[in-house]
Amino acid sequence: MQNKLLFTSESVTEGHPDKICDQISDAVLDALLEQDPMSRVACETAITTGLVLVMGEITTSGYVDIQKIVRDTVKEIGYDRAKYGFDADTCGVIVALDEQSKDIALGVDKALEAKQNEMTDEAIEAIGAGDQGMMFGYASNETEELMPYPISLAHKLTKQLSKVRKDGTLSYLRPDGKSQVTVEYNEEGKPVHLNAVVLSTQHDPDVTQEQIHEDIKKYVFEPVLPKEMVDEKTKFFINPTGRFVIGGPNGDSGLTGRKIIVDTYGGYARHGGGAFSGKDCTKVDRSASYAARYVAKNIVASGLADKCEIQLSYAIGVAQPTSIMIDTFGTGKKSNEELTEIVRKHFDLRPAGIIKMLDLRRPIYKQTAAYGHFGRNDLNLPWEQTDKAEELKKYL
């Protein structure tokens, strides 16, 4: 039993400067993985008025046209004319990637990783984590996708905002935008009321705020907000500054990895601090966070807990996690210690084991770079599958 509480989460559209950078970094990663699934990639992007900078380190046998990837990605997002303050065709693109020779990789790396899915247990054990760090995964049965309600709703709003812009329903909208929702939870920890909704959207200069308010309510709020969660006490804030014409990279600079809470659980669960986009699956910041979500989601889907948070930690060069911690916040059918042992038995959480378990050497990452990496029922992501849930039910 808990006290009533209000919890707030936010989302941003694909046209937000930080999210543009995430999408460019993951577009580069996907393009390299298409050519060479063994590519090692650490690709960071920065964006500002009229300029994109792509930097980092890659080890690959593939070759991709980075400039074209940048321009195509920016155009796809919707920055395709000068009056938006940023134009994919005319912006400057600086590439500062250190392209390392494929021969630099140690022979042992090549031998161990060449046939990832055929590796022996000894080979998996031999591949250590690429860095130290801790990663968290979370799941809750408060939504169909087993995500916290506030971030789930915030993403639905920004996705709908993008949809009505792209399909021409609201042609005066521009790509940048944000949502924020405040949800009231009752004593049982269930979401019961929508306390506040904030939505800011970039727009053409000649549209009135009255028109924007009317259209956002009709075309964004009505299709998305559950009627049973909204009443006369719900507060709505639409473009509360009164004007949002200057936006995107023309309004703010952006960087890869600046929206890690939007990418994950909206602040409802803890975060280890590592960003995802632009990193290949040998980086545990990304792969172990995906594995932690996979574990937590299967525990909740199996009925072993209503809520589950898992922490993994790694030491550089060591395969086995240095720690596994599970917290079910008093909702578990087994103790946290028992669940930890169950996880050790059923999930291979060594870096190479994660790559094999989730088949991560594929170009599947750009689609995750906006609107969240988790709870994406619209995408067939391996870490969102609940294929272990049936197996775990035997512990009920």
Swiss-Prot record:
Residues 100-110 are annotated as: Flexible loop. GO terms for molecular function: ATP binding; magnesium ion binding; methionine adenosyltransferase activity. Pathway: Amino-acid biosynthesis; S-adenosyl-L-methionine biosynthesis; S-adenosyl-L-methionine from L-methionine: step 1/1. One of its GO terms (cellular component) is cytoplasm. Mg(2+) binds at D18. Its cofactor is Mg(2+); K(+). K(+) binds at E44. It is an enzyme of class 2 (transferase). Keywords: ATP-binding, Cytoplasm, Magnesium, Metal-binding, Nucleotide-binding, One-carbon metabolism, Potassium, Transferase. Its EC number is 2.5.1.6. It is found in: Cytoplasm. InterPro entries: ADOMET_SYNTHASE_CS, S-AdoMet_synt_C, S-AdoMet_synt_central, S-AdoMet_synt_N, S-AdoMet_synthetase, S-AdoMet_synthetase_sfam. PANTHER family: S-ADENOSYLMETHIONINE SYNTHETASE. This is S-adenosylmethionine synthase.
